[in-house]
Swiss-Prot record:
This is rRNA-processing protein FYV7. Residues 160-208 form a coiled coil. It is found in: Nucleus, Nucleolus. Residues 19-29, 37-48 have a biased composition (Basic residues). It comes from Yarrowia lipolytica (strain CLIB 122 / E 150).
Length: 229
């Protein structure tokens, strides 16, 4: 029984606590899956370009993103990748030749256009920043007097002592007294003027004729003035 149990453990039976069989070759299965996907992708690309050629359409040319690499680095990379299978190597070569047509990689002309556009944007930004830094012709640097005044205005004010506060309070009281007296004098003059006007009107309204009858002319003038107002 013990030998059978050990045998099941060696075979990877999970019932006896051993490692499941489907996890023993997980790394190999992953490699096979990657190779299969690369082969399928290369076949799809090859069939697509064959179809374009058959229909007479132009085949887009894509530069490899590794075209600018040095030959030494390319040879070293080829030596390191010698362990890979022929199918994966062929698919990778197709991907490099097509420049990642299905992967969304940019071609050489598109990359140049993007680089030119980025250079133009940088030049525009530099020109704008230079224009901002240039002073306007109308603006002039402040003079020494202006700088001195600005410095004096920015200085914190010193607190007033008792004598200065008393003088300021006295000045304010004197100013308020003068304003109050001026207002009183103005009101007095207005009242006197109104009294004179009223007395004059009363005198005109009390005028009579030789026979003692009230004179109608001032009364009519008063009514007309009220209507005009």
């Amino acid at each position: 029984m013990a030998q059978e149990k050990n045998q099941h453990k060696r075979q990877g039976n999970s019932f006896y606590g051993g490692r499941p069989r489907h996890t023993q070759n997980r790394h190999k299965a992953k490699l096979d899956e990657i190779k299969k996907s690369l082969t399928h992708r290369s076949n799809v690309k090859r069939n697509y370009f064959k179809m374009l050629k058959k229909e007479g359409l132009s085949i887009p040319e894509r530069e490899s993103k590794f075209s600018e690499d040095k030959p030494e680095t390319v040879e070293k990379a080829e030596d390191e990748s010698g362990d890979e299978s022929e199918g994966s190597a062929g698919s990778e070569e197709d991907e490099e030749q097509q420049g990642g047509f299905f992967e969304g990689e940019a071609s050489g002309s598109e990359a140049d256009d993007l680089e030119d556009g980025s250079d133009d944007d940088e030049k525009d930004k530099e020109d704008q920043s230079a224009k901002r830094r240039k002073p306007l012709p109308d603006q002039q640097p402040p003079t020494k007097q202006q700088l001195r005044e600005m410095h004096e205005s920015q200085k914190p004010r010193k607190p007033m002592n008792f004598k200065e506060r008393a003088a300021l309070a006295k000045e304010r009281k004197q100013k308020a007294r003068e304003e109050r007296e001026a207002q009183i004098q103005k009101n007095k003059e207005d009242r006197e003027r109104k009294l004179k006007k009223r007395a004059k009107l009363t005198k005109q309204m009390t005028k009579t004729t030789r026979t003692g009858q009230p004179l109608m002319t001032p009364r009519i003038n008063k009514i007309l003035d009220q209507l005009k107002q």
